[in-house]
Amino acid sequence: MTQRKFPRYLHQHVKTILGREPSDEEQSLLLRWVEFDKQRRFSQILTTGEGTGAPVSLANLFRSKGSVTLDDLGEVMGRVANDLIASGVTPHMLSLYCRTPRPDKRGVRTTVNRTAKAAGDEPVSFGFTDYPFSSCIVAASSGDQISEEPSKEATDGDAVILLHSPSGEGLMTPLLQELGDVDKCIIKVRVEGTDLSTQAVRLTKLLQMGVYLNGKSLIVVGQKAFIVVCRNGSENKIRKMARKHNVSASLVGRISKDKTYRISGDDISLPLSCFSLFDSEEVVPSDIRTPDELMHQSGITLNKIKQPKSFNSTFLVILGTEECVVASQLAAALPGSSISISAKDHMVWCDPKRGAQATVAAAVRGIVSGGVAPMHAAVSVHLPERLTENVQYRFREIAEGVSTSTTAFQLSINSVRVWFSENIASPLLTVAVSGLSDSVAPELTAGFKDVGDFILMLGSHRGELGCSVYARLKLSSADGPVPMVDLAMERQMREIVLTGNKVGLIKSVIHLSAGGLAATVAHALICGGTGLGARIHVSSKIRNDELLFGETEGLTIISVAEESIIEIERLCMNSGVPCTAIGRVTDNGIFTFNDLLKVKVKKLHESQKESRKKIFG
């Protein structure tokens, strides 16, 4: 990263604070700090929670070239768990989201298989994009709610110790867990990057205390390191604990009460106020104009697509796409997961604000479909290294979309990570949502259960084809408009699903996903009992392809016993949610949809099996 020139007006401010000319070393440190602190300032735009710890956290693994190794994946999974442990949270669930180019690109299948293997029994999902990088993997971990314990305050003379584990995150985990029970341990902070001197600035700002660093101890370290502040006199105990776990522990400084940052051997002595001079700089200017590509989107031209009498062949092609294979895989995942991770890159590109809303909503649906009530969110944004006006505008819109949707769902965003990379051209958003499972309620699954059950559609099907799989296949483009996201309606549907499940009314639930209504019903059949079929009949004024393949956001399909219909309809009516009976579960092993589709369920299984083999090998 190119270091910018020290601004003249800030030079004057620093000179006024110091009562002297700042040294070259001090100016260099201040400039390194402002670049280092850029992540925090961008993150603050997205953060709504309070406190240093969070019940959900994120870590990232980015590769511009080549496939990832199992060791790489193990490190990113260990990193996200250790970050939670350091904040006082016990991790109990982990999820991975893997972005790669489409599977026909070299090395993609290797990365996909290794990611699935590394995840083991933990939930993992995949997104296939047309971006040029090799892979972008985000790990999310959730844990128990932080107990309301009074925070410990640092005092003059407390030791600053660097814990470093060159051999990997795994060695750090038991040490961090043990340090959590040490009363004399004040705070544990991850070392971000390799410049320990700038990381120490972050520590002083967190503690609002000064620090005196040993210049000879400011070694270059990797990201497998933490700074620990402990009570004066407990250094040997910490070293002994670290040695037991094969982690190096070095005393790098002391906390001081005078709120001054000093490094021995260097010409650096700065009051903490100097490091706040950049805080007034506007991170994202408010007067940036809308980029041309967002102002002039052409949308979908449906009259170019001919309407056949039967959609069987088109349906099977759609069901075999990467998007639908991943959706089916997620539908078949173990129920009751307390964490869900989502990304909708193409939607975010076409409409950053609405795409961000759709991303949050999808993460919420991911755990609601298992009967889990969403509570917390973590947000990850990858930004290009070069922050053009276009990128800044898109980030601002993403932040607005995340804010409106998390507010609507009453989620607390208490973990935000912003990363910068020279290998991407546009922001990438990833959202993880964690929640609390009701131990009394039965676990919900996606598959249809019993012959004769009614299939109900919650919400209004608008048949939107913008950003859809169908549009990509038929028009070689999946551009906007991005489907509307009705946050108020989604919140009501969430409560219906959770309440209906708690009282035993709902047998299965699946949210409309890639491929539209036809593909979603197919996923419920693939995940359902042997020999089952489905007879669907929907009256609609929209086009047949919109009805079958339109990807309306938030639409939910549930199955219920006949005796439960009246109670479910009453729940929906009281909440203002449209509820429509669209079909029944049959025993003939055939999926019919109006007179447009008639496919054996056995054929659906075969199509998915062949497509999974192409993607996963």
Give residue spans per PLM region.
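Glycine-/charge-enriched secondary-structure boundary and capping motifs
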Residues: 2-29, 108-135, 176-303, 391, ...
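Glycine-rich phosphate/pyrophosphate-binding loop regions near the starts of catalytic domains
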Residues: 12, 19, 25-167, 213-219, ...
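Catalytic-loop motifs flanking and including active-site residues across diverse enzymes
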Residues: 73-76, 171, 196, 356-359, ...
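Active-site glycine-rich loop that binds ribose-phosphate moieties when present
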Residues: 144-148, 169-175, 491-493
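Short, contiguous, pocket-lining structural segments
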Residues: 167, 171, 192, 489, ...
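Charged, low-complexity, helix-prone segments enriched in Lys/Glu/Asp/Gln
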Residues: 335-337, 358, 362-366, 376-378, ...
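Long, low-charge, small-residue-enriched segments that form tightly packed helices used
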Residues: 481, 485-487
